[in-house]
Amino acid sequence: MEDRRCDVLFPCSSSVDPRLTEFHGVDNSAQPTTSSEEKPRSKKKKKEREARYAFQTRSQVDILDDGYRWRKYGQKAVKNNPFPRSYYKCTEEGCRVKKQVQRQWGDEGVVVTTYQGVHTHAVDKPSDNFHHILTQMHIFPPFCLKE
């Protein structure tokens, strides 16, 4: 077998040990590219997150009737909280609203419901059915999530 020694291209650095710049069997026929010849990186658009709204409601049941229909798609344990968090999606076709439901850690009588997105359809049930829930809700400003 032929012993071919080729130099490995390193960024401009004079402090590289010459013994590290040689490898056996490496083809060095490709020409190095300069920074002006490199392909520009495509800038990916950052996905904008929809606003989130959190509500605290004093209730003995976790699933509150808010007038929409929901499908549960997950549940997970949360650190430092004995109560799991449940994940729901709106069942209306084309509606991308999600909600998370979890009991508050210090006060298990409080249910925290976080909504993400805005419904693209009318409410399924009249609002007078859950007037008592609305009177108990504490509305918080949208979360500012940083990536």
Curated annotation (Swiss-Prot):
Designated name of the protein: Probable WRKY transcription factor 45
Entry GO terms, CC: nucleus
Region Disordered, residue ranges: 21-52
Major subcellular site: nucleus
PROSITE patterns, A to Z: WRKY
Organism: Arabidopsis thaliana (Mouse-ear cress)
UniProt GO BP: phosphate ion transport
UniProt entry keywords in alphabetical sequence: DNA-binding, Metal-binding, Nucleus, Transcription, Transcription regulation, Zinc
DNA-binding segment(s): 59-124
Record bears the keyword Metal-binding: yes
Compartments, as annotated in UniProt: Nucleus
Keyword Nucleus appears in the UniProt entry: yes
Function text: Transcription factor. Interacts specifically with the W box (5'-(T)TGAC[CT]-3'), a frequently occurring elicitor-responsive cis-acting element.
Protein residues bound to Zn(2+): 90, 95, 119, 121
Family: Belongs to the WRKY group I family.
GO molecular function: DNA-binding transcription factor activity; metal ion binding; transcription cis-regulatory region binding
